[in-house]
Amino acid sequence: MISKDKRWQNKDYIKFVSEMPCSNCSVIDGTVVAHHLKHRYSPWGGGGMGLKASDILTMPLCYDCHDRAHNGDGEVLDFQAPFIFKTLDAATKHGVISITYKPYEYYRL
């Protein structure tokens, strides 16, 4: 049996992402949701059929752009990586995400 990595979930982070303008069209209309990374970047943990990426791999998308992403629109899907980086940058600048340094050896299994 192949084990699945536990995905990182954080409701506060998802709420923060949902309050941002849409990454694709910049709209702020109350329909923005946190879109999880999709199939084109699955090596990054983008899930797959019945799987969802970790909450850290999200970006804000309005209803229309989110619908386009889930219908395979390359104009949205091809820019997921930079949208996620932009979202992470905003979260770090606003103190939503903070990093505490620990040596690499600390994380070894």
Range-by-range predicted roles:
Residues 4, 9, 28, 66, ...:
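Intrinsic-disorder/low-complexity regions
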